């Protein structure tokens, strides 16, 4: 056994010389590092005061051709309008590798290709104006995008814009975007998860389609705070999460605080699911499913402090077909100065083909639950809910042309203006239907409710 392991001194010396020669090989001929190619091999220097766009672009192109990640050491790199080819991977040290925009419509962009990865980078916009159709990172028609563990700050426009992309945007921090933190247009099946978004000028996460069609994006486990509406409007801006024309989108388990308008707004968004979100301090309705949509599941959300809680609306434009189940809504009635006071303070409002079941609503100075708006009421059931401390417990439209509603098994406490009251738009036109008068409205079924 010892013979097999006997060491030859001459062989050992020869091996040592060979190892030393390998260590002394010039940098330009260095093999791939464990984490990929080092950008320093191409003359890219962290902390250099000059613009390093040309050197960085050369390094990106070489690494992409080699199908290897490009590694950027800790430090500041000043550059702009860097182009990413198919398979490009830029890897930095989280919180320490900083790319600062100097020029161009974007800091990093790509058109076409697939498998583009950005990881561990801090990308700074430096408040340099960006075109509306671009972003600090702008990817067009890229498959299998991955943006992870990055920080994006001071984008004077959109922080990230994804057009016609699919892939994953996860665990990033986006702060101070003048327009949107993340704008996705005509993309499919994105996973947007675990991001922290703060101080966006017009929107947190926007999932849009240019025409109504399948999207399938999942927006989950994000924290979105302090969303403004710098461009004004009546709800086009100022939403933490906005889904527009995009069908089959799931918005779940997000924590949303302080938005100029809405926590989650689905506009013409068919088959949207809004599940388990925590929504606090909204200046308009906390959760909206509105305009020309068919299909919405709104369940298990916690809403505290908003103008209104949940609105499933615009039957006049085709908005219909939803379930509103298991939500906790409290402390509504905080009114935007530019909105009429009579529209504030509703816990849950619905119009057509909707089941409202198992919700708890507390402190709703207008109405705990409102069913219908003028003639826009059809096939609504309101069952097994608890309403406490409201103006009207349940307000139901009884104008000519309003359709059917079933109101059963609800518990209503402290409804100052009546437990169940018939309405013509904002105006009450009946007494408390729980006590008397319900027989005049055969389209209403009112049974087994309790009030005190």
Task: Spell out what each predicted region is.
Residues 39-71:
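Acidic Gly/Asp/Thr-rich repetitive segments characteristic of extracellular carbohydrate-active
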Residues 26-41:
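C-terminal segment of N-terminal export signals and the immediately downstream linker at the start
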Residues 57-65, 77-91, 98-144, 159-165, ...:
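Extracellular beta-strand-rich solenoid/capping regions of secreted or surface-exposed proteins
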Residues 229, 252, 268, 273-282, ...:
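Core solenoid repeat modules with strong leucine/isoleucine-rich periodicity
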Residues 109-119, 137-148, 165-168, 188-191, ...:
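Surface-exposed loop/turn motifs in large extracellular/passenger domains
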Residues 2-20:
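N-terminal secretory signal peptides and thylakoid transit peptides that target proteins
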Residues 101-109, 129-139, 154-164, 176-187, ...:
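Extracellular beta-strand/beta-solenoid scaffold signature
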């Amino acid at each position: 056994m010892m013979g097999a392991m006997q060491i030859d001194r001459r062989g050992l010396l020869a091996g040592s010389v060979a190892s030393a020669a390998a260590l002394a090989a010039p940098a330009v001929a260095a093999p791939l590092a464990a984490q990929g190619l080092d950008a320093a091999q191409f003359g890219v220097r962290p902390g250099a005061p000059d613009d390093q766009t040309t050197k960085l672009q050369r390094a990106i192109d070489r690494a992409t051709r080699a199908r290897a990640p490009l590694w950027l050491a800790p430090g500041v790199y000043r550059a702009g309008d860097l182009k990413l080819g198919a398979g490009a991977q830029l890897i930095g040290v989280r919180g320490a590798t900083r790319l600062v925009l100097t020029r161009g419509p974007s800091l990093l962009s790509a058109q076409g290709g697939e498998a583009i990865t950005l990881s561990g980078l801090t990308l700074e916009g430096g408040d340099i104006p960006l075109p509306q159709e671009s972003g600090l990172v702008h990817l067009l028609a890229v498959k299998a995008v991955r943006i992870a563990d990055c920080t994006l700050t001071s984008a004077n426009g959109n922080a990230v814009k994804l057009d016609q992309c699919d892939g994953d945007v996860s665990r990033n921090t986006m702060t101070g975007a003048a327009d949107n933190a993340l704008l996705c247009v005509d993309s499919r099946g994105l996973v947007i998860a675990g991001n922290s978004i703060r101080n966006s000028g017009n929107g947190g996460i926007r999932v849009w389609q240019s025409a109504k069609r399948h999207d399938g994006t999942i927006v989950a486990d994000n924290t979105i705070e302090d969303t403004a509406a710098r461009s004004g409007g009546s709800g086009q801006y100022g939403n933490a999460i906005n889904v527009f024309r995009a069908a089959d989108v799931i918005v779940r388990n997000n924590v949303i605080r302080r938005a100029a308008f809405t926590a989650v707004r689905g506009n013409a968004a068919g088959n949207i699911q809004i599940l388990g979100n925590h929504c606090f301090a909204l200046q308009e309705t906390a959760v909206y499913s509105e305009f020309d949509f068919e299909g919405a599941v709104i369940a298990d959300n916690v809403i505290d402090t908003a103008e209104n809680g949940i609105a499933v609306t615009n039957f006049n434009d085709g908005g219909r077909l939803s379930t509103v189940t298991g939500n906790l809504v409290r402390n509504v009635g905080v009114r935007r100065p530019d909105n009429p006071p009579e529209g504030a303070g509703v816990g849950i409002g619905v119009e057509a083909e909707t089941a409202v079941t198992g919700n708890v609503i507390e402190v709703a100075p207008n109405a705990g639950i409102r069913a219908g708006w003028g003639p826009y009421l059809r096939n609504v059931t309101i069952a097994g809910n608890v309403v406490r401390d409201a103006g009207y417990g349940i307000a139901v439209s009884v104008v000519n042309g309003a359709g059917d509603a079933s109101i059963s098994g609800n518990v209503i406490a402290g409804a100052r203006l009546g437990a169940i009251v018939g309405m013509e738009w904002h105006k009450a036109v009946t007494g408390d239907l729980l006590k008397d008068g319900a027989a005049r409205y055969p389209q209403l079924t009112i049974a087994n409710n309790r009030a005190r």
